[in-house]
């Protein structure tokens, strides 16, 4: 039986995924369950980047997501004002990324490929653990590291870096909040709740699942199906009550293959 994928990423990303899935022959709709806001303190983000630019050592900025990258460079540009040149990446600095989407965002913002470190494109997972496996043997003692992220999030990687002797600071380059669904999105949510077998949810964050639970309190999920981009996210979907949950790599090609497998039965 065919099914339509519900892409719950932030609105702009969700719409892009819908188009990419359509090109692969997969029906999809955007139902954003996370809204992205700008950095709450652009001046603080710019100050961090200025320190990186002025450093004579080899500082590292760890970007945890594409939103972290885009929010960071937008905040720097905003703080420096209209007419200022676009921020150029200092080649003595390294940009660490947790996955291919973050790498793509860095390249889009002008970071040279030779300055980027990330898990291999064929890695089984794209997360802090996979990134740490790539850089654990770097010389971290007294090295300056900025972790660029949104509000909240795990501190696992930060703790590994501190234990290795790095001077770790956290920079918030964007904020994640619960979405304000428009009328069409609310109607789509109602359809998905009324006919769960017609849909497959695609989750790329546990926070999106929490927002879904808040938007549909008391809903039954035992007939619903989901794809999750990480085991922790799959655990959260299972805990909410989803009847079938599969783990899939965070790419449209992988999602298309998983949808085909899930709907074959």
Q: What does each of the following model-derived ranges do?
A:
Residues 1-265:
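Conserved beta-alpha
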């Amino acid at each position: 039986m065919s099914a339509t994928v519900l892409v719950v990423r932030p609105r702009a990303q969700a719409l892009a995924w819908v188009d990419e899935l359509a090109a692969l022959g997969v029906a999809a709709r955007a139902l954003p369950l996370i809204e992205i806001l700008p950095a709450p303190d652009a001046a603080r983000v710019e100050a961090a980047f200025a320190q990186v630019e002025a450093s004579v050592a080899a500082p590292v900025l760890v970007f945890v997501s594409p939103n972290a990258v885009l929010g960071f460079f937008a905040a720097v540009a905003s703080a420096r004002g209209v007419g200022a040149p676009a921020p150029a990446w200092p080649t003595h600095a390294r940009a660490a990324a947790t996955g291919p989407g973050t790498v793509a965002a860095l390249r889009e913002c002008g970071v040279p490929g030779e300055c980027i470190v990330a898990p291999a494109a064929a890695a089984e997972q794209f997360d802090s653990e996979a990134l740490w496996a790539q850089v654990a043997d770097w010389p971290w003692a007294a090295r300056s590291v900025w972790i660029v992220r949104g509000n909240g999030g795990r501190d696992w990687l930060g703790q590994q870096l501190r234990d290795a002797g790095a001077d770790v600071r956290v920079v918030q380059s964007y904020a994640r909040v619960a979405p304000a669904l428009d009328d069409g999105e609310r109607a789509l949510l109602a359809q998905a709740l009324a006919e769960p077998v017609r849909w497959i949810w695609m989750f790329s964050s546990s926070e999106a699942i929490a927002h879904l639970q808040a938007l549909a309190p008391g809903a039954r999920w035992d007939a619903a199906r989901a794809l999750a981009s990480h085991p922790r996210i799959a655990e959260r979907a299972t805990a909410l009550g989803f009847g079938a949950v599969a783990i899939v790599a965070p790419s449209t090609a992988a999602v298309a293959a998983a949808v085909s497998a899930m709907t074959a039965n």
